[in-house]
From Swiss-Prot:
GO MF term set: metal ion binding; N-acetylglucosamine-6-phosphate deacetylase activity
Cleaved signal peptide residues: none
Family: Belongs to the metallo-dependent hydrolases superfamily.
Name used for this protein in its record: Amidohydrolase tasK
Binding positions (Zn(2+)): 187, 189
Composition bias type Pro residues, residue spans: 7-21
Organism per entry: Hapsidospora irregularis
InterPro entries: Amidohydro-rel, Metal-dep_hydrolase_composite, Metal_Hydrolase
Disordered: region residues: 1-36, 86-107, 819-838
Role played: Amidohydrolase; part of the gene cluster that mediates the biosynthesis of the tetramic acids Sch210971 and Sch210972, potential anti-HIV fungal natural product that contain a decalin core. The PKS module of tasS together with the enoylreductase tasC catalyze the formation of the polyketide unit which is then conjugated to 4-hydroxyl-4-methyl glutamate (HMG) by the condensation domain of the tasS NRPS module.
GO biological process per UniProt: N-acetylglucosamine catabolic process
Amino acid sequence: MDDQKGPLPPYTPTATAPPPASMRQRRPPGRRRALRRSRTVRVLALACLAFVVLAQWKQLWRGERKAPPYLSVDKLNDNLETCRKLRVRPQDPAGPGRSKNDRYLDGGGKPTLIRNALIWTGEPVPGTSDEDARAGVGWAWWLGDVLVERGLITKVDNKMPASEVPEDAIIYDAEGRRLTSGIVDMHSHAGVSPLPGLNGNDDTNEASDNITPWARSIDGLFPLDPQIQVIKSGGVTSSLILPGSANNIGGEAFLIKHAVGRHDGRPELSAASMLADPDRTWRYMKMACGENAKRVHGSRTTRPVTRMGESYDFRRAFERASQLVRRQDDWCDRAGEVGVGSMDEYLPEDLEWEALGAALRGQVHVNAHCYTVNDLEAMVDHSNEFEFPIRAFHHAHQAHLVPEILNRTWGGRPPALAIFADNMYYKAEAYIGTPSAGKMLYDQGLTPIYVSDNPVLNAQHVVLEAAKGFHYGLPYHAALASVTTAPADTLGMGQRLGKIKAGFDADIVVWDSDPLGVGAAPVQVWIDGTAQFDDPVVLSKPHARAEKDTVVVPDAPPPVVVEEPVEVADVLFRGVTRVLLDEHDVSAEDGASLNVAIRGGRISCIGECADEFRVAIDAGVGVVTLGNGHLHKTFVGVGGTLGLNEIDGESKTGNGKNPKTFTRAVDGLLLGGKKLRAAHHAGVTRAISAPRFKGGGNTHHGTSVGIVTSARTSLDAGAIFGNGDVAVHYTLDLSVRGGDDESYSAAFGSLREKLIRAGVHGGKEKEVGAEEVGAEEEEEEEEKAFLRRVLASEMVLALTINSADGIATALRIKDEVDKKQQKQQQQQQQQQQQQHGTSSGIRMAIIGGAEAYLVAEHLAAANVGVILSPLQSYGETWDARRALPGAPLTNGTNIDRLLDAGVKVGIGLKEDWEVRDLALAAGTAYENGGGRLTGRQALDLVGRNVLEILGVEEEEETPGATMGESGHFVVLLIINMFCGL
């Protein structure tokens, strides 16, 4: 101890050493113990005092300490508020109980009473169990009124008492028409991929990187995109506007309503004013698996080249976002513990990863574009590894094969499936699929949703996808839910959108017929209670089924969906209600049906056929009983690449392109594939296809070939009709403008020159012994030989053109060449006249024809037929921008104007997958034609007319070969509400 040590003695040379310890003076033992206790007490006292002082000082320091001078206290407090938001998982915004729509403007539109409507509420009748409801019990249309106030549906009743209707209410009489909520399209690119497509306007994909969670579709949304209004005319009131699928993570999507500017009831013209939920309760993100990212980004120096690279990019992105989430959580935890004044840095924020971090927090509904089993499984694995839910898989062609994988998705809620009804075969990922997927998914307890992927499909007709789903077996209520309540719920808006119910947004559609029927169109659309069309065109539908009951139970789906058709030579049919054939045009009396006997591939009896049935049954012939069968000629698929291509996006599976070379389709046939089986299944027993020019499948260059779709190879008996070469095809649409040095004038000028040169040398054949020519000269001579046949009226010149200007130029060239030919014929010698005959002029056909109605009278005067491919163009390209959208925007469509002018019209294919829908196209023309067409005339649009326009003579339809002798007719099961033919 210090007090026991005296000072050192001064140094002196004479000083003696200290005495030994044994001789030193000792204190008494008691004294030493007392000193020790004293010192211990003093040390403890000092320690306690020090502790108290330190504690007081720390308390004082904490209360008075300020953040470092380089940090803003206001921002730190904002950061703390952000912490609170980061840890809140959104709840679906409430609907019922609101006093007004969140989008409603004070002083907005007047109340509206919609009277006398056949209402589909989107819910089964009260008291229906969930099990019964899913099975289709408790659903019905019922007659009633809907009151709309302050942007909301405020009351739905069988008959609204006058006392409950505001005095200033607008009264709209629905006249017994069907009323539903607005259609919700959960996959659209409207506004970011404006039409017509121009490079300067396209903002679909931010392809600068493969991982772009920071991209936002709203920043590219163009409110003046014309298709926003066209889509609305199909009853679509809300759309999820997604970035494209070029990137594995494409960015944020936004849910909009199709009301634009003051005319539509909005306060301003802006993307922000179109948001369906101004509070942005939920956020949405687009991700994409598979082929697209590999194709767009993959190379030797950039990922992904394979799906392995894609998974790494996904996982690395999720890891980085997870790191941001952890850093934020750590900051928030510490700030909550010690106070923001103790923080020496702001909350970690990173704009690049903020949205993806929010997805990992469950604040973003992830929408993943994934087609295949391996892509679906990989994405589900990612969701479990990084613990985030997936709200929906889009496209998902193979999802019906793997419900177990889907049910393993993290979070306990399996994703919904946003699908097409029958759009497939366009790339390898879409090669495995079935139009029955909607039914199969529903039966597996999953949620099918039909979408447009606009402009891939015209979202104006997205409800037709649901109708096709119903046709392929999805229950009626589930089919209608697939474009109303199901997408609304999946988007987190199930308390505001998708139902006709008090408290829901007043997004309402009144239809001219059953919305799941062919050709259904709105007569009026309301968004937030504001009527969207001042003077809507209402179609006259003499064939529509009138409803007399106040409660209508929806039709059942077809009882059997046959995956593969059966070819038989002998069969008996019961339950046929309509026969539409050249020699037979018979309809059964109301409530009755017809029997049809077919023996040896030919119809032997129509009617009661008692004797024929007895003899045939005794001989073991099978009997097929139908509910509402129609017997008619089969269909012809024209305009696509049927028989020349199997997977559109995979060049190895097709004949290839012919931008420079004139070829014959008969030399490139590839039969026996899925497309042709699908065609045959749909009653399309014949197809006429030309070699592809370039670009899409609806460009043509060379001679077309006629094939029977059930043939396995071109050597099968009767596999080819039309003598091997049907028509001579050239493409003169926008695809001829492929380079800076290519022009319309050059393309049309080249055709004129070829025709004139063929006519000048029309009578001369190659002389025996003449000098051999090279391959290029041979090809030119072959092309010239076919053009001579065109000039001699032996073959049709089929031109693929959409623009009215292009069609006008083609008609001028035809007139010019015809006059030259007439003059030359007058000067020819008798020998030449006998050899080639006298031409009556070029027989021309137009394929495509999106703007043909603008020159309808000229087409009729020139006797030029038009094969509309498709029936109703969407105006996707500049040369088709004047296409007519139809009711309620325009009085009639292209086909109506052409028929009125006397033009012979057929319906063809824009893409091969449409081959299943030719009957629907004919039905649409029939239902929406205002009585212009009989049932048989409508069917001729996809049969006889096509053959006549392309010059296939009647005797060529049924060649003498075995396959042809069977006759081309088909028996289809038709649901009354689905097709009025």
